[in-house]
């Protein structure tokens, strides 16, 4: 018998197939491997301002490459998974490239190929059309039914709606451009008063649309000097229009440059052009405001396409670097501007070609010990870069010419160094001696490098730094009664936007909660808030649709440059530490010729500083008053009636703040104990902490008692406070006999007068 032939196993076949696949894979992998010299290396660009590069000059990098360890050949490389091999290879020079041969080279005429193509093409087209016709027929039927149904509905609606304005409604979508042009022309105002300044028609059109009929004194004085190419130091009171005084000449230069480019027929790329102006401000809010005002001026100017880059903290650095690439005007705070310039490539070189350097609120930016970054920026702009040789000499000469063409514009309401001296303390006080214009010039010439030896110093109001329509007052009270008098002042001025200034962030947080507990629409603004929260507070406070009685409790962050319409009342909860701070705080009201009030709530220990403040600010007054601040006397009946409300609100606020602080401290101590591997006992820690005697022991004890208030006690206090707030403050009127003659019943029914009081209360006029 013959032996059966054994059948091969499936596993052996699979292994053979796998071997074949592996071999082919290895072969493909060997073809994909390249050496170091074949890779397309890219040079790493270093930042402009790098103190220590650590020897990494000429560093090169490459992405998307896997390293393969070989034998005798050493390291080899291949493209990462999903990337083609061509992406990592060095591009060959044109002479090294091999000639390409086209497979579809023409080799004469062929009748067969043509006929085949002619035959196959229509057949394929017919098949496609037949397949496409089947669904389209059904779709057409459905479309017809839908159209008929819509037509029936339209006829029914047309019969039901027989309104006379039907024709007008049908015209709305197709308004002509002529109608829009007529509306734009009607919106403008007469700007003939601006023509004497020699402005372009585009700027005059923008001013007309923005409804600026006449220029202010600082604008009349500064704009012609800046247009003539002079360096200018402008001093004017708050709210006098300093932003347009330097914004208009900058846009004039931009429009003139744009006209020259159009005449020459060249269109420069936005990314390659250097900015024409750098504007620096001390606060983020002021920078946003400058960008808004100059942006509106550029938006309404026909033919203007100026791009404004806003560089402030709290926002993405990478995004701001991208925006800076094609910007015409750069506005920002010194810290973020220096961070963006020093971390980028070629930005400092590009920024050194600016035509205008504007320093707003210069006394704050250039004061000693503040804004070190501002000095770095000024030094980088004026520094001649070293290391350029040979053919780059012409470039250096051009850049030196660009620096020589740069105009420096400096603006503020207070240039006097004497105003920056602290008012309180036992240090030697220099009295009311205010620096002359010559001394102010010397002070600024030491800080800045002007193009001209003697820049134009324009002082619009040499007698006083305060606005003309501002009324100043002072309320004297005890140190522990400031909350009471603040609430009373706010009741005296309902339906008016009020700005309350404090000297600390903790006071802002406490006062905001206190006023909110008293039923007042209070918002907070301080430097520790996130940038979005800061912008949100300013928008809510300044919005025309917001509560007209809105209150913004802020630190000196809001003291400079913030232009919010409708602020009628400024309250200094703490006396300012320096005279220039008082000038800028009070300048948030009585802007652009309007009237306003500024009141200081003064404790006995602050009286010395307030007297010095008045002597400094009003040293050159013609009437010779030593204390021009008018003393205000509040109705004692009102103060006594509202004391219970304020005490309850203060207890609730202090309890909430104490609970938050204790919880935060416990969480921190508990986390620290866990990290150390130690058991944390809060009672033992408190007993050990209470043994010592110190300055803050009484404060800690009050905080502990406030934190021990239970939820039920808090709820009871809230209910009592709510009941008190629901009633008007009675100032000696019998509620049973309202018609006794002391109350105007008709005015009460009409809602006239001050709705906070029941009875006659004299308004706070001074």
UniProtKB/Swiss-Prot annotation:
Q: Where is the composition biased (Acidic residues)?
A: 95-106
Residue ranges the record marks as coiled coil:
none
The record places domain Helicase ATP-binding at: 223-433
Q: Where is this motif: DEAD box?
A: 360-363
Enzyme Commission numbers on file:
3.6.4.13
- Gene Ontology molecular function: ATP binding; ATP hydrolysis activity; RNA binding; RNA helicase activity
This chain belongs to which protein, by name? Answer: ATP-dependent RNA helicase mak5
Q: Which organism is the protein's source?
A: Aspergillus niger (strain ATCC MYA-4892 / CBS 513.88 / FGSC A1513)
The top of its lineage is:
Eukaryota, Fungi, Dikarya, Ascomycota, Pezizomycotina
Q: In the UniProt record, what gene is named as encoding this protein?
A: mak5
């Amino acid at each position: 018998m013959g032996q059966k032939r054994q059948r091969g196993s499936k596993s052996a076949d699979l292994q053979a197939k796998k071997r074949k696949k592996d071999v082919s894979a290895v072969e493909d992998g060997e073809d994909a491997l390249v050496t170091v010299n074949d890779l397309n290396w890219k040079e790493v660009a270093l930042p402009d301002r790098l103190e220590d590069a650590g020897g990494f000059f000429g560093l090169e990098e490459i992405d998307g490459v896997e390293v393969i360890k070989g034998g005798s050949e050493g390291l080899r490389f291949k493209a990462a998974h999903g990337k083609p091999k061509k992406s990592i290879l060095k591009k060959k020079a044109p002479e090294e490239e091999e000639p390409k041969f086209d497979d579809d080279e023409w080799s004469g005429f062929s009748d067969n190929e043509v006929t085949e193509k002619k035959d196959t093409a229509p057949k394929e087209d017919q098949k496609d059309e037949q397949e496409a016709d089947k669904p389209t027929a059904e779709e057409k039927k459905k479309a017809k039914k839908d159209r008929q149904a819509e037509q029936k509905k339209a006829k029914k609606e047309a019969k039901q709606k027989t309104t006379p304005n039907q024709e007008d409604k049908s015209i709305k979508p197709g308004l002509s451009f002529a109608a829009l042009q007529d509306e734009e022309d009607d919106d403008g105002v007469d700007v003939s008063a601006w023509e004497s300044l020699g402005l372009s028609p585009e700027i005059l059109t923008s001013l007309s649309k923005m409804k600026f009929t006449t220029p202010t004194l600082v604008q009349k004085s500064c704009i012609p000097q800046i247009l003539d190419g002079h360096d200018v130091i402008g001093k004017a009171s708050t709210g006098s229009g300093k932003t347009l005084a330097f914004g208009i000449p900058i846009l004039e230069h931009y429009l003139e440059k744009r006209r020259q480019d159009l005449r020459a027929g060249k269109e420069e790329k936005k990314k390659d052009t250097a900015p024409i102006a750098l504007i620096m401000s001390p606060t983020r809010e002021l920078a946003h405001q400058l960008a808004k005002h100059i942006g509106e001026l550029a938006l309404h100017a026909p033919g203007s396409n100026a791009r404004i880059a806003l560089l402030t903290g709290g926002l993405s650095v990478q995004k701001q670097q991208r925006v800076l690439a094609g910007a015409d005007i750069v506005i920002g705070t010194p810290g973020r501007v220096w961070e963006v310039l020093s971390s980028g490539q070629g930005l400092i070189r590009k920024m050194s070609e600016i035509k205008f350097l504007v320093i707003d609120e210069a006394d704050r930016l250039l004061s000693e010990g503040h804004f070190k970054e501002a000095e770095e920026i000024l030094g980088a702009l004026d520094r001649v870069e070293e290391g350029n040789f040979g053919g780059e000499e012409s470039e250096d000469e051009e850049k030196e010419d660009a620096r020589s063409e740069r105009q420096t514009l400096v603006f503020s309401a207070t240039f006097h160094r004497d105003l920056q001296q602290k008012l309180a303390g036992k240090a030697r006080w220099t009295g009311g001696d205010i620096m002359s214009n010559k001394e102010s010039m010397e002070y600024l010439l030491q800080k800045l490098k002007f193009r001209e030896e003697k820049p134009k110093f324009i002082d619009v109001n040499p007698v006083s730094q305060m606005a003309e329509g501002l009324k100043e007052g002072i309320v004297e009270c005890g140190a522990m009664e400031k909350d009471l008098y603040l609430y009373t002042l706010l009741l005296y001025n309902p339906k008016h936007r009020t700005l309350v200034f404090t000297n600390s962030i903790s006071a802002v947080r406490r006062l905001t909660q206190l006023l909110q507990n008293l039923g007042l629409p209070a918002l907070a603004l301080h430097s520790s808030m996130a940038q979005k929260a800061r912008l949100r507070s300013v928008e809510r406070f300044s919005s025309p649709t917001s509560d007209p009685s809105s209150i913004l409790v802020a630190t000196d962050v809001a003291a400079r440059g913030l232009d919010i319409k409708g602020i009628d009342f400024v309250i200094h909860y703490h006396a300012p530490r320096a005279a220039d701070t008082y000038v800028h705080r009070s300048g948030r009201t009585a802007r652009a010729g309007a009237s306003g009030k500024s009141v200081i709530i003064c404790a006995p220990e602050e009286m010395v500083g307030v007297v010095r403040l008045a002597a400094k600010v009003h040293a050159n007054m013609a009437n010779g008053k030593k204390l021009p601040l008018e003393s205000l006397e509040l109705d004692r009946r009102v103060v006594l009636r509202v004391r219970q409300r304020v005490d309850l609100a203060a207890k609730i606020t202090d309890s909430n703040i104490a609970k938050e602080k204790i919880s935060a401290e416990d969480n921190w101590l508990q986390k620290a104990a866990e990290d150390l591997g130690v058991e944390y006992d809060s009672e033992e820690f408190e007993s050990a902490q209470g043994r010592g005697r110190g300055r803050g022991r009484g404060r800690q004890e009050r905080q502990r008692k406030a934190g021990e208030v239970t939820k039920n006690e808090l709820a009871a206090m809230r209910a009592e406070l709510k009941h008190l707030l629901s009633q008007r403050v009675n100032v000696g009127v019998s509620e049973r006999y309202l018609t006794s003659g002391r109350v105007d019943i008709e005015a009460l029914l009409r809602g006239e007068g001050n709705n906070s009081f029941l009875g006659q209360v004299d308004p706070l006029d001074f």
